[in-house]
Regions:
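A charged N-terminal "starter" segment
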Residues: 1-179, 212, 216, 220-222, ...
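Glycine-rich tight-turn/loop motif centered on a GG-T
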Residues: 44, 102-103, 126-129, 148-154, ...
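C-terminal active-site-proximal or functional interface alpha/beta core segments in diverse enzymes
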Residues: 44, 236-335
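Acidic, His- and aromatic-enriched active-site or binding-groove loops in soluble protein domains
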Residues: 110, 129-133, 178-183, 204-212, ...
């Protein structure tokens, strides 16, 4: 019997029993029985089925795996995660995610004004919000408003102009400044289909020289105390973990040097996304497990902090597809 690679991509979320594809949960309903029930209600055309329990499972797996690695290596920093809203902004996905993530302080990542408004509206107060992407004055002002609402928000600047806008808004509004993060443009690139979105030739992030310029600008405007995070992203859906290790070492050294310069409140490294899931039905394309991923992140950052004599940083991830991909099934009529 052809199982269409379900043993490769399903991660036990779906199984084949008695010749039927079934949801591996509670009474194990078959997909075809779900479809028949929906058709009886006179719904036509393709169907998009969502399974919130799978989203909940992925959130728990991500946090439990990283927290287990933290315990194993006696790591002093904490693990934190935010969900990138660009992956899925629909209410029937976001509401279960917010509810399940509350116990972990799971947050949201926004890359546009619309996404930031969603995060400000639905994120659990106290859970982190990170802001990436292009930011004009209006979006940065929204970040200040989010801070005034009590949100734990970090605006991650990708160019010196964004830092200049933060200073401008701060001077105009006299509002409390949000946390500031620096996206660094590493020499290390990623692996897989989206590898070019990271590395030294990427259009995103600050070079080493620009990082120093940004630090001096923050010093001149009394903003160093708001610098809490450095961020990198070496590409989505990495099929190998080796490039991540290089990026962790490079970013770890930048973190340590900034700490030694005087950025005393800098306490976090955001490793971006990149955690892959299997899409292939014929062979495995991801050559690492989540446990290996977490162990390498924890071990590498602990080692660098020890070498440099600085505090072990808190760790942030922005994994999207790992959390969301498996929970949605598209079913189409066969012509």
């Amino acid at each position: 019997m052809n199982n269409y690679g379900i043993d490769i991509w399903s991660d036990d979320n779906f199984v084949i029993e008695d010749g039927l594809a079934k949801v591996n949960y509670k009474c194990k309903p078959s997909l075809i029985s779900i479809v028949k029930d929906i058709r009886k209600q006179d719904f036509k055309g393709p169907l998009l089925l969502r399974f919130p329990h799978i989203t909940e499972k992925q959130i728990n797996t991500l946090y439990n795996t990283f927290n287990s690695s933290i315990k194993e290596y006696d790591y002093k920093g904490t693990f934190n995660a935010v969900f990138p809203l660009k992956v899925n902004q629909l209410p029937n996905f976001i509401h279960p995610l917010i509810n399940e993530g509350k116990k972990f302080n799971y947050g949201l990542e926004a890359g546009s004004k619309a996404e930031l408004v969603i995060a400000m509206t639905y994120n659990n107060v106290g859970s982190p919000i990170t802001v990436n992407g292009f930011k004009d004055k209006e979006m940065i002002h929204l970040g200040f408003i989010a801070k005034s609402m009590g949100h734990n928000i970090t605006i991650i600047i990708e160019g010196l102009n964004e830092l200049e806008i933060i200073i401008e808004v701060l001077n105009e509004t006299k509002m409390e400044c949000p946390n500031i993060g620096l996206r660094v443009r590493l020499h290390s690139g990623g692996s897989g289909l989206w590898a070019k979105s990271g590395g030294i030739n990427s259009k995103f992030g600050l070079t080493s020289t620009e990082i120093l310029e940004a630090y001096e600008l923050m010093e001149d405007n009394n903003l160093v105390k708001h610098l809490t995070m450095i961020h990198f992203h070496i590409g989505s859906a990495m099929n190998s973990i080796k490039p991540l290790k290089k990026a962790l070492r490079e970013s770890g050294h930048i973190y340590a040097e900034l700490k030694n310069l005087g950025a005393t409140n800098l306490n976090s490294i955001n490793i971006g996304g990149g955690l892959a899931v299997e899409y292939n039905a014929y062979e495995r394309t991801r050559f690492y497990s989540l446990t290996e991923f977490a162990n390498d992140v924890i071990f590498t950052l602990k080692d660098i902090a020890k070498q440099k004599g600085v505090d072990e940083p808190n760790i942030f991830t922005e994994s999207g597809r790992f959390i969301s991909a498996a929970s949605t099934v598209l079913i189409t009529p066969v012509l």
